[in-house]
């Protein structure tokens, strides 16, 4: 059994800082307005999947940051509070748009999933039929004689 190597706080913070620096550069270059934090999450995920970064190298700091997530969302809550006038004026319309968009999204996702399942089912059935035809050519002769 090999023991996990323990990485220090500064090492983990440096890894996160480099990822955020690169993600800020990518977000600035890409013409699509994607937040640098989202680019950073995707970049970290890819680096972990490709085993460029080991989980142990970022796990402790990542867990610590996750435990602080409520505190990190306080600025968003304050921003909503600053927009309270807009929320009071258009609150019902905002809620209705969110509900309508959610229903449309769920419906479209369901229909698209059914379409993919039916197409993959047809392909599987066609593949099964071809396999049966190739495996038993004598059955085809019997069908022709009848």
UniProtKB/Swiss-Prot annotation:
Protein's membrane topology: Multi-pass membrane protein
Residues passing through the membrane, by range: 7-29, 34-53, 65-87, 97-119
Function: Inhibits the expression or activity of extracellular murein hydrolases by interacting, possibly with LrgB, with the holin-like protein CidA. The LrgAB and CidA proteins may affect the proton motive force of the membrane. May be involved in programmed cell death (PCD), possibly triggering PCD in response to antibiotics and environmental stresses.
Family listed: Belongs to the CidA/LrgA family. LrgA subfamily.
Annotated GO CC locations: plasma membrane
InterPro entries assigned: Antiholin-like_LrgA (IPR023736), LrgA/CidA (IPR005538)
Alphabetized UniProt keyword annotations: Cell membrane, Cytolysis, Membrane, Transmembrane, Transmembrane helix
Gene Ontology BP terms: cytolysis; killing of cells of another organism; programmed cell death
NCBIfam families in alphabetical order: PRK04125.1
Subcellular location: Cell membrane
Pfam families assigned: LrgA
HAMAP family cross-referenced by the UniProt entry: LrgA (MF_01141)
Protein name, UniProt field: Antiholin-like protein LrgA
Coiled-coil features, chain-numbered ranges: none
